[in-house]
Regions:
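Amphipathic alpha-helical segments that form well-ordered structural scaffolds
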Residues: 36-43, 122, 126-130
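Flexible, surface-exposed loop/gating regions in the mature catalytic domains
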Residues: 90, 108-120, 128-129, 138, ...
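Active-site-adjacent structural segments surrounding the nucleophilic cysteine of cysteine proteases
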Residues: 1-117
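Active-site-adjacent substructure of cysteine-protease-like catalytic cores
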Residues: 125, 129-178
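Hydrophobic (often cysteine-bearing) scaffold residues that line and stabilize catalytic clefts
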Residues: 29, 33, 123, 175
């Protein structure tokens, strides 16, 4: 047993998707990339507010407004069990998920059909340019590393209290470096 980072245990449906687009009257998933990114952002409680994000996002021909208010990280619990959270807590996490989705160019999918998807390079770029994370945030491929170096890099991130987005089965990772 190595070090374990205590991160949020969130998913892609209610209340997380309360602000994602509705397509043909049906709710959409937040997307695994947006959810994982939100969990990392909640762990870091950063940023305080977005000042460089998109103001609208087009999903299947419909423009959706994106408005930003300061994040209230303390109103985003690590767990959203049914009946255990307030409307304000639901609204806070839903806004975060929508902000991420719009800024990573999420391809939204309707619940029960196809999932919502995003590109890892778009996530890394949004973390750097929109959400004001370190310019060292990067998207890397396991195939570019020897196993020992890959394992060492991941262990170092965890040891430095830096959760990362890890994507399977491609075994690619976007890391947040201070």
């Amino acid at each position: 047993g190595g070090k374990v980072l205590q991160t949020a245990k969130w998913n892609q449906e209610e209340p997380y998707n309360n602000q994602t687009p509705v397509i043909n009257g049906k709710k959409t998933y937040t997307g695994c990339g947006a959810t994982a990114t939100a969990i990392i952002m909640r762990y870091n409680m950063h940023p305080d507010v977005v000042t460089k994000g998109v103001s609208s996002y087009n999903v299947r021909g419909v423009d959706y407004s994106v408005s930003y208010a300061p994040y209230q990280w303390d109103k985003m619990p690590l767990n959203y069990n049914p009946g255990s959270y307030t409307d304000e807590e639901a609204s806070q996490v839903a806004a975060l998920m929508w902000h991420i989705g719009a800024n990573v160019k999420m391809d939204y999918g309707v619940i029960g059909t196809v999932g919502s998807s995003s590109n890892g390079t778009d996530i890394a770029e949004a973390l750097r340019s929109v959400f004001e994370y370190s310019p060292a945030v990067r998207y890397v491929y396991k195939s570019d590393y020897r196993w020992e170096d890959w394992e060492k890099m991941i262990r170092n991130e965890i040891d430095q209290d830096r959760p990362m987005l890890y994507r399977e089965p491609d075994q690619q990772v976007a890391t947040s470096l201070s």
